[in-house]
Amino acid sequence: MPSFDTVCEANLVDVRNAVENTAKEIATRFDFKGTAASITIQEREITLIGDADFQLTQIEDVLRNKLTKRSVDVRFLDIGEVRKIGGDKVKQLLKVRSGIESELARKIQKLLKDSKLKVQGAIQEDKVRVTGAKRDDLQAAMALIRKEVTDVPLSFDNFRD
């Protein structure tokens, strides 16, 4: 029986490269000379540090540019609030999303059930496996999911015939 997996997974290698390129640009830009502006990544957490809020927004804009150039959707980033740290500096945490949340998985499953397509959706940890009798039904299900779920960057992999 043909099937595919619906996942929400960023390419962490490209994310890391984008963060490193952002750090290089911050080090060479004139408006960041002599400031505490920096960006680091540890696993799925990106840390921005700057002297003021506007510096954080500038660093975030540079990061968004670098991510876009590497074809990484910026909707993978969960942006945290700006916090003050010692010495008149501010810090912001960005988390890289991984996996489909259970609420969204249930929404996708209900969407498939209500669509009258001959497919079934099964929630498996952080992904949704869609199975159907025909390949055409699966392709219609992919199109339906792409059309209806726009707030999270979803991709389809593990297509089996």
Swiss-Prot record:
Name of the protein described by the UniProt record: Nucleotide-binding protein Veis_3464
Sequence similarity: Belongs to the YajQ family.
Disulfide pattern: none
Molecular function in Gene Ontology: nucleotide binding
Cellular-component GO terms for this entry: cytosol
PANTHER family assigned: UPF0234 PROTEIN YAJQ (PTHR30476:SF0)
Pfam families in the cross-refs: DUF520
